[in-house]
Amino acid sequence: MRSSDKKLDEIYHSGQNRALLISATGTGKTYAAAFSVKHLMEQKKPEHHKRPIKKVLFVVHREQIAIQAKNSFARVIGSEHGQTYGLLSGNHKDKECTFLFSTIQTLSLDRILKDFAPDAFDFIIIDEAHRSGANSYDKIMAHFQPEFGLGMTATPERTDDKDVFKIFNHQIAYEIRLKDALDYNLLCPFHYHGISDLKINNEEQKDFSNFAYLTSDERVKHVLQKAEEFKFSGERVKGLIFCSSVDEAKVLSEKLNQHNLRTTYLTGASKPEARLAAVDRLAGADGPQALDYILTVDIFNEGVDIPEINQVIFLRPTQSPIIFTQQLGRGLRKAAGKEYVVILDFIANYEKNYLIPVALSGDNSYDKDSMRKLVMLGTKVIPGASTVEFEKVVRDRVLESIDNARTNTVELLRTSYQAIKNKLGRIPNLVDFYPHNGIDAVKFFEKKWAHYGSSYYGFLAKYEKDYTGKLSPLQAKMLSYLSGRFGNGKRVAEALLIESIINNKNTNADFFKEQLLKRFGIDASDDLLKNIVLNLSNQFNLTGDQKERNKDVVFVEPIGTEDFRIADAFNRALNDETSSDFIVQLNDLIAFIYQRYDLRYSKRYRCMDLTLNEKYSYEDIPRLLNWSKYISAQIIGGYRYDDETNTLPVLVNYNKEDDAIAYEDHFENEEYLIALSKTNRKVDSKDAEIIFRKQPEYKNTKILLFVRKNKNDSETKTFYFLGEMNAIGGPEPVAVPKRDGTGEKVSAFKVRYRLESNVRRDIYEYITES
């Protein structure tokens, strides 16, 4: 049994009467529905108390799609048991058949709908179910009372308040998104090319609402040149061109025809027969009536099945990952003689270019580093045989857009939250966002939600009308502190200690160490235990202001130097009248920390709370290295030695700001790094003694490399951890210019490091690519 059949079978026989099938454009939702209906028709299970499936209604939004669906069902189910297939649309009025395929526009007419009894159909399928919040769909679904209703869509998420998941009782029969479909080889591979839109007189265009520019002869020639350069798969081109407006599509079609191409344009006003004829001319064999391209704005975003398309051209900005994916999907259906589809995306300096990597990857976490990696490495992070390439000028535009993008806005967080809530049918927990491809829930901790603090609770209290939990000011403050400092899941120790206190009403060092070893395989050192207590007793503060502000945010109190107990403040917070809501929020946060740790940080590097190739901030590093006090980024500078833990992190900003001291840190290759010391350091300085381990006390010093690609991004000041390294040879004296612009030089020394593990190739290329 197909997985979609199996899940639908379970839902169908559980007593539910609706479900949703989510499948990427091009993966064959219609065939999946046909096979599912056939499977259910062949079953004989009287115990489910549903009447046999004899009559089926398939509702679509265009006649052309109804015709294609009718043909697909007829192929799968056949007619050996008397099945008949008909169309109900503006041009067809077949009502007396066992399988009826109808357009929503015709069926929703009162004079048509009244001809059907509420129980006229046993099984109803709603295609493009994300439209089902519209009034016409509501009308039909309210009229009919089938045994079962199945919604089908590639994109159930909507930008309005309509909840598609609720309409289908939050029952998901099957879900496969674009990335998975490519992984499973269900789609035709695509070769995506991000191409610079036209410059006129060697100047980049700024106003892309300028109709004269959009339809200029120069732009037409530019598009044709690139289309010829990147070709297509098959005997002749069969392309779709998506434009910004109907007028642009019309004029560009006329101009392309002047270049011996055969094109037409279609709009929402085009008659069904005109659309059908155009599609047949595009998809068919070469001949006098054949078309090379159809130009449109959005009528081919969904539903229409044209497997023969071998080239898709985007002449409009990406404003929505959903629409981008829908339009990309027009070319992803497999067809005979078609090895791949070519995607040409003409990219100007648009503000929302950062949405392109989101759409191509299908990653809705909005993690900027993931976006950059796709732009830089493209093909290496796209599954299957598909490829992604950007021209350098385009790549720079998209990277700049990523730098400038705000990916933790209230609007974005609320949209992602609502999508997950709609899907689940309840208020999501923090752990729900990852498995349902939601935004990285850490972003909820990055904003202050009025007086509620920087936590998921703060977001819920401010924006979720169905949330009834209430915390005291101190509880909200404590939750905000835990979320901001430990919510990223880079270390589980603090979360485990809080959990131990909640579950046992108190705890001590011995019990905690036993639990840490038993549950996570971590042998707690004295330095780790000391650092945890400092962090949970308001003694490891980033600033003096924080210490004063958080003076009552104390979870444990030290007992001597080797033990601790629950702090009075935390004990009160766990036992006042709002403690139940507080504990629910704490447990949700703890579960999220464990989840994130398991996903990203559980492969600990040499018994340290660091994971190779993961990212860490200036704030993370002193804590995770178990330093006894926080050291600011300004004091750390490029490196800092801690004598208690015998650790020396080296922090490299690979893209320097223009006003930075001219440090020439660079990789020679994946194994060797050249780095400079701080200024006013000589080859016989203490820094050189430590780095080159010239004294016995420095023999076991751990020199740890952290590198980040971009220093200008205010949202993601994080460094890749690339492991331990060792200085080789000896310090080489150099003179570097001072920052004051006087040209005066100061002393420093150069170090050649050898990494103990070569930098992973994709990270190396991403960091070093200019």
Regions found by a protein language model. Give the residues of each.
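Post-DEXD/H (motif II) to motif III coupling segment of the RecA-like Helicase ATP-binding lobe
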Residues: 131-191
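Walker A/P-loop
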Residues: 14-38
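A short beta-strand element within the Helicase C-terminal
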Residues: 292-317, 323-326, 330, 341-346
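Conserved interdomain linker/interface between the two RecA-like ATPase lobes of SF2 helicase motors
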Residues: 172-240
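Long, largely alpha-helical accessory region at the distal end of helicase-like NTP-driven motors
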Residues: 228-229, 233-234, 245, 360-495, ...
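Conserved helicase ATPase core of P-loop NTP-dependent helicases/translocases
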Residues: 89-93, 112, 250-251, 261-300
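Acidic, glycine-rich low-complexity segments with interspersed aromatic residues
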Residues: 457, 471-482, 495-497, 609-718
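Conserved segment of the helicase C-terminal RecA-like domain
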Residues: 321-326, 330-364
